[in-house]
């Protein structure tokens, strides 16, 4: 039964719909088809926004050499990973630690190869979980930070560096770099009352390859580096490496980790972990090919299963550096320094709590 007209002369909703349908059926067939497609497509478009967790797994890579170089080294492994987890894997390779850190903060990275402070921040602040840690052929549980200088005089001795740092030009890593900044600052420069950011005549900030080349080519006088990257540098730049010497080396630093977004299903994280820990372990041609890929990735021997607790040494390093900086900084009064130290203690306690989560 039709709805009666409203008393004010307007039509009821049912009458309006019938009028609309009569006009719609009078349209040419082509226009009716177009209108139907648009009408039906609107709700689909509104609900078909793809979640990042349903799209490609976005893998972030530390810029250890250069962006292109890092990507080409990882491509074969990531192609196999894509097959193993039955999902596409895209690569984010950047030119700086800062660029990778910003991408992680914008949730543009789902999985990453990170070390030290960056891995720690990803786990404690950006909802990531550790699934694996790299191992190298030397069998050591870590690597060492280095200070490199030219063999040729005059600026070629640790004694001279300690006595006159303002005469030296520094080439260092970014502040997020464990061996390029954090460990040299904590274990060498600050104990000798030298602030890396202010005591040198000039500085170059870049990758480990960039810093080593800067000293070899006389663009800087001392560079931060590490044992793993310097070995790689010797192979790629033998003539330049021959000009360099090691002035200092640190205590052992734990190897880098693979972290995965916490929102991914546990089953996917386990499959990623299983793939990584099995990569390069097989016998025969396939295993040989995988071991060649691993060797190109900073002479890696493979991966071992790991969890968030593997970042406890990194948390301890960051805590020690923050305390050192607070103790040596200038403050308006003792209360301000004490407040800063209390915030450092509180932040460290929170990190330790997060790192106790060792669930898969």
Residue spans for each PLM region:
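N-terminal secretory signal peptides that target proteins for export/translocation
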Residues: 1-29
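A ligand-binding cleft/hinge motif common to bilobed small-molecule-binding domains
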Residues: 116-126, 189-190, 216-217, 221-242
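An extracytoplasmic/periplasmic, membrane-proximal ligand-sensing/linker region
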Residues: 65-66, 72, 76, 271-360
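Bacterial N-terminal signal peptides
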Residues: 32-43
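Boundary at the C-terminal end of the N-terminal hydrophobic targeting segment
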Residues: 46-50
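Bilobed "Venus flytrap"/periplasmic-binding protein-like clamshell domains
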Residues: 54, 58-82, 94, 140-213
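Short helices/loops that flank or line small-molecule/ion binding pockets
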Residues: 98-112, 125, 143, 208-223
